[in-house]
């Protein structure tokens, strides 16, 4: 089957002429990587997040109507080596569905594919344990979003449901990831008010790679239906 979706899939053009999907995508491709959209739910409410003002990202409607299970995702991926990497990501926080991540990533590794997990670093808070050792041999690259240089700024910009202690827990999540995962990168959105230089310096101090992410402006209205 290859790259797949759940439900009918149609394309139309927005006012700028961009072709976009009118039905939500569970699996979508960007730059030869295949992204698995696991959930709409997140433990942050970052003020710059596309999911707060749109259903769309890179022309794909990512507001899924049903949560895909592991078998469905495997069926959609089909040939992992076709892609540069299989990325656990989407509109929400993927570690909310840790079991699915472990199930699918094991299958991907069994079929000689590469994996990456995009996360806000709340996985240990969500599951009340250190989940990183459970991902040894399953995740090749961890991309951890860190959009603030202090606990107070993290509250201001990311509005985490776990409160003021979230920031220090994310830092610890990064440290644990560096211990167990082959490649770890900290990513920061280039948004007004966020001290990206401080985030870069923190990444260097911790021993992680650093990548500055483009701020995605709203281009499509949020559909609440």
Q: What is each stretch, according to the model?
A:
Residues 2-15, 21-24, 79-81, 86, ...:
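Auxiliary Fe-S-binding modules of radical SAM enzymes
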Residues 21-68:
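Canonical Radical SAM [4Fe-4S] cluster-binding loop centered on the CxxxCxxC motif
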Residues 56-74, 94-137, 148-149, 189-197:
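Canonical radical SAM enzyme core domain
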Residues 71-91:
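Short Fe-S-cluster ligation motifs
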Residues 136-151, 210-216:
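Non-cysteine beta-strand/loop elements that form the S-adenosyl-L-methionine
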